[in-house]
């Protein structure tokens, strides 16, 4: 028996109304008071708005450097396992990834005016020849920046001349550097005062972080460009 025309219309209207209510509940339309469908499958933790990540600047510094300053980060090696890093103006000058670091002293020479890398080398201070290091740092030109990061042992092969040259570059700690100490330093040829950029931790069995080695050091900052470099 077929439904009469008016009854058909009533059934159609009711069907449309029910469908609209169901869709509104699932999609959470305006004023529905129901959560949206995707929220039904989302954990409370994931719905929390993530805190904005702190912005990092060149070499990972938390603040930008002033004009006419160079951003840097120097990290010493950790024991004899993790190599050191030297970053300048967001460019990695020395690291294990670049395969240009080694046991001893890792040194990058930089033009203090332009900020361009002049040369980067590692010097073995346990079994190497200290004369190689002396030939590297003796002829530095005025205004050359010197970045140093230790790895494993920075001092066994050091002699008085080596310590004196680093002291003239602005180091306070070169004269007392010893076997397996951790050391990071930034100096320059021609400075009149001691550098503010230096950290040193003595190798001591009472305070070492690693078995046989002190903690790794990390130093960052902004270096003013030199006025002259020849």
UniProtKB/Swiss-Prot annotation:
Residues 68-226 form the GG-type lectin domain. Residues 1-33 form the signal peptide. GO terms for molecular function: carbohydrate binding. Disulfide bonds join 59-87, 65-222. GO terms for biological process: antifungal humoral response; antimicrobial humoral immune response mediated by antimicrobial peptide; ATP biosynthetic process; calcium ion homeostasis; gene expression; glucose metabolic process; insulin secretion; mitochondrion organization. Pfam families: ILEI. It is found in: Secreted. Keywords: Disulfide bond, Lectin, Secreted, Signal. Transmembrane segments: none annotated. It comes from the Eukaryota. In similar amounts in testis, pancreas, adrenal, placenta, brain, fetal brain, liver, kidney, skeletal muscle and heart. GO terms for cellular component: extracellular space. PANTHER family: UNCHARACTERIZED FAM3 (PTHR14592). Belongs to the FAM3 family. May act as a defensin against invading fungal microorganisms. This is Protein FAM3A. The gene is FAM3A.
